[in-house]
Each structure stands twice: as C-alpha cells, then as structure tokens.
Amino acid sequence: MNYMRIIFKKFKARMIVGCILAVIALLAVSVIVFINQASFGRTPRGERLERVMKSPNYRNGEFKNQHETLLMTSDRGRFSGIWEFIFRKIDGLRPEQAVKAIKTDLRKIGRNEEILVWFGHSSYLIQTGGKRILVDPVFCMASPVSFVNKPFKGTELYTPDDMPDIDYLVISHDHWDHLDYNTVKKLKDRIGAVICPLGVGEHFEYWGFDKERLIELDWNEDCLLYTSPSPRDLSTS
C-alpha cells in the first residue's frame, strides 16, 4: 500500500510539473504570436539598417538623445515607478460626462482654405497652401490591446473614412498612440507621401507602402513640402 502511495505521489508531482510547464509553454507561444502581429511592424533591415547604423545619433544598438535626459526623477526604482503608474488611482483622471465636440465634414472643405483640426493628443490635420498634412492620426487603437488607452467618450468622432485625400502623412515616432496600424492601413491608398523618423519607414514598407512614398529623416534633417504659392520647409529637431 505504501509503495502504491509513493508511486501515486510521484505521478501526481509529475502531473503538476507537467501542467505548469504546459501553461508556461502556452503563454510563451501566445506572447510570440501576439508580438508577431503585423500591427507591431518590423525592425529595420538591409539598406535602411545600414543608414540607421551610420547615423551619428545611433550608438550601442540604439538611438541616443543628443542631450542627457533623466528618465526617472524620483527616488523610487523603475519597477515601483511603473507599478504606481499603472495601478495608482487618480480622481478626476477621466471626464464623467462625454466631452463636447463638433464633427466637421472634412471632405467638403475646399483646398484653398487654411485650416487646422485637432483630433486629440497629437493627432491633427493641417491644410495650407493647397496641401493636406495629417499628423500622427489615431482613429482606431492607441495601444496593442483594446482595453488600454481608450478614448474619452465624445472624442471618438472621426474615423479614417472621414479623412479627405492626404498629401503628406507625418509620423513623429512609432509609439502606439502616435502610429496606429489600422488607421494608416485604411488610409494607405489616399496618402501621397509619408514623412517619418529614420527607421520607422520599415513599418510602412512592411505594411505595403511603396518605398518611393517614404521620406525618412534623422534629427536635424529637413525636407521641402511643395505647397502653393511657395515650398515650405519641414525640419526635425
């Protein structure tokens, strides 16, 4: 009887270990599948990677700020800071009522009008000199998962379908709340050119944008936007 108990305990222990390993393996596979979605884009390669590595701002495998920047200003460690940022409750963080906003039919605005429409955060539409410039549009998701970074009620007025044809799409950087995969995919065929930081063009090429439509700029580089009556300079800093 004791012998059978020992065998059963060993079998039970192996079953528990096996179940734990199976759960870990399943989680690992799930994470790998999740981060390999098209929406995560692709890291630079080929000629683009060579240009990135030749940048004076790229050192030790990453871009470096030109000036020293403090990431943590408190005495707390990084983990405790992240924990507090995620789980700390702040009163009044979200409006109790829907934000009042007026939706404009952007497609009916003539190209000769000078306008600026702010959609929230860093997303806005500029129309100047007969050209339309769309900056950091986020009309679908501002994070990899739908339950994080949800828009305030009343601010989700616009969709990609509401946008007019765009001459220049400007992306400041590739954080989720500035580069929305679903938005740019839906606008792809109505965008003339994409202006983005060095290396970020890899995402767009991976998503089906022609390489000829991509203008990638390093810090302190600039390009001319052909607007009427005269060209305008767009510089990075």
Residue ranges and their predicted role:
Residues 204-218:
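Helix-loop-beta element that forms the nucleotide-linked donor phosphate-binding surface
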Residues 115, 193, 213-215:
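Conserved beta-strand segments of alpha/beta enzyme cores
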Residues 126, 220-225:
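Short acidic-hydrophobic surface loop/beta-edge motif
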Residues 3-143, 148-150:
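Metallo-beta-lactamase
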Residues 175-179, 201-203, 221-223:
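Active-site environment of divalent metal-dependent phosphoester hydrolases
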Residues 147-195:
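Active-site metal-binding motif and surrounding structural segment of the metallo-beta-lactamase
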Residues 226-233:
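Conserved small/polar residues in nucleotide/adenosyl-binding loops
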